[in-house]
Amino acid sequence: MKVILLKDVKTLGKKGEVINASDGYARNYLIPKGFAEEANKTNLHIWNNKKEAERKQKLAEIEAAQKLAAELKGKEINLTVKSGENGRIFGSITGKDISDELNKKFKINIDKKKIVINNIRQLGTYDVEVKLYPEISTKIKVIIAEK
């Protein structure tokens, strides 16, 4: 019996694959447990439509991330903080601080988790990476000045 795997099954294959399984194994285990469904015309058509919709959504997300990366490229933000002697700041600059400043200055809303930042504990200029999508990232310049 041909079945479409709905989940990864260690011994059979990955989600979305159409495989041949014995009738008893498919009817008594795979289908009732939700690991697979019968591979008839209707289910194959539904599965192909779902895959196509996911592919289109992924392309739209990549396009939006590339557009945002182009918009962010070369942007510069200024943060003013209290500092002690030798230019050492009190506390540290976080992704949330940078995200809030980007939103305030450029009206660009970026999740703080997408901002890759090392510990910034000194006054100065830093290049900060913003990961918008797994393979799409850009750098912005962050200038830390004393209040």
Swiss-Prot record:
Keywords: Ribonucleoprotein, Ribosomal protein, RNA-binding, rRNA-binding
Stored Pfam families: Ribosomal_L9_C, Ribosomal_L9_N
Keyword Ribonucleoprotein: yes
Alphabetical GO biological process terms: translation
GO cellular component: ribonucleoprotein complex; ribosome
PROSITE patterns given in the database record: RIBOSOMAL_L9 (PS00651)
Coiled-coil zones: none
Disulphide-bridged cysteine pairs: none
Entry-linked InterPro entries: Ribosomal_bL9, Ribosomal_bL9/RNase_H1_N, Ribosomal_bL9_bac/chp, Ribosomal_bL9_C, Ribosomal_bL9_C_sf, Ribosomal_bL9_N, Ribosomal_bL9_N_sf
One term of GO molecular function: rRNA binding
Family: Belongs to the bacterial ribosomal protein bL9 family.
Functional note: Binds to the 23S rRNA.
Protein name: Large ribosomal subunit protein bL9
Organism this protein belongs to: Clostridium kluyveri (strain ATCC 8527 / DSM 555 / NBRC 12016 / NCIMB 10680 / K1)
Gene: rplI
